[in-house]
A protein has these predicted regions:
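Short, well-ordered coil/turn segments that N-cap beta-strands
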Residues: 46-51, 72-74, 112-115, 134-135
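Single conserved hydrophobic/aromatic residue that forms the stacking wall/gate
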Residues: 1-16
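Glycine-rich tight-turn/loop motif centered on a GG-T
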Residues: 17-27, 86-100, 140
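Glycine-rich phosphate-binding active-site loops on the catalytic face of alpha/beta enzymes
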Residues: 7, 76-85, 135-152
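Hydrophobic faces of well-ordered beta-strands that scaffold small-molecule active sites
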Residues: 51-56, 76-78, 116-118, 137-139
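Conserved, mostly hydrophobic/aromatic
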Residues: 67, 79, 129
Length: 158
């Protein structure tokens, strides 16, 4: 039924339950705590949904104005690694081409009052993107942080 929604409003059709959207209502999924929640409360749960659109390629940049006009999106999250690959320089997330593309997204999104997020590998990158205006910063991953802590601990024993 998603094809019935206006192209720009598809995310909201997915997010919201009746009467505003067409979100599935199966109570036996994770969102419903595998049926461990009150069946009527579940239908109200679309009020508690956080919509994060991931911008990870050239198409996202090309369609950014349209994306920025979608109502109800809470966060635009830039995926720097996938974006770098889409730009033809895989893994080079600090390459000026990638950085400038990301800065453009941040500027345009902030001009529309949108919250922007991204992933960073280093404390230096975190500081840089924070200064640029990114409000939601995801640093490393749990396993990476754990490995770094183990390496530091091991060094302290030497």
């Amino acid at each position: 039924d998603l094809h019935l929604c206006d192209r720009r409003q598809r995310q909201m059709c997915i997010r919201d339950s009746y009467p505003y959207g067409m979100r599935g209502v199966c109570r036996f999924v994770r969102a419903a705590d595998y049926s461990n929640c009150d069946r009527y409360k579940f239908f109200e749960s679309s009020k508690d949904v956080l919509i994060i659109l991931q911008l990870e390629g050239i198409k996202a940049i090309e369609n950014l104005d349209e994306i920025l006009d979608v109502e109800g999106v809470d966060i635009l999250f830039i995926g720097p690694y996938d974006l770098s690959q889409s730009l033809g320089i895989p893994g080079q997330v600090n390459n000026p081409v990638v950085v400038n593309a990301m800065k453009d997204i941040v500027e345009r999104a902030k001009a529309k009052g949108k919250v922007v997020g991204t992933f960073v590998d280093t404390p230096q990158d975190l500081k840089m993107w924070k200064e640029i205006g990114v409000q939601y910063l995801s640093y490393s991953v749990d396993v990476g942080i754990f490995i770094d802590a183990c390496k530091q601990l091991r060094k302290s024993f030497e």
